[in-house]
């Protein structure tokens, strides 16, 4: 869970997705 994780946060979808 973080800004640069992208766990469905909706603000940044990086390597997590």
From Swiss-Prot:
Q: Name one GO cellular component term.
A: extracellular region
InterPro entries under this entry? Pyrokinin_CS (IPR001484)
Q: Which residues carry this modification: Leucine amide?
A: 17
| Location (main, coarse) | secreted
Q: Which domain of life is it from?
A: Eukaryota
Q: Where in the cell is it found?
A: Secreted
Tissue pattern of expression reads:
Expressed in abdominal perisympathetic organs and abdominal ganglia.
Q: Name one GO molecular function term.
A: neuropeptide hormone activity
* Residues that span the membrane, as ranges: none
* GO BP terms: neuropeptide signaling pathway
Q: Which terms are listed as keywords in the entry? A: Amidation, Neuropeptide, Secreted
Family stated for the protein in its record: Belongs to the pyrokinin family.
Q: What does this protein do?
A: Myoactive.
Q: What is this protein called?
A: Pyrokinin-5
Q: Which organism is it from?
A: Derocalymma cruralis (African cockroach)
């Amino acid at each position: 869970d973080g800004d640069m994780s992208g766990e469905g946060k909706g603000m940044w979808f990086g390597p997590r997705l």
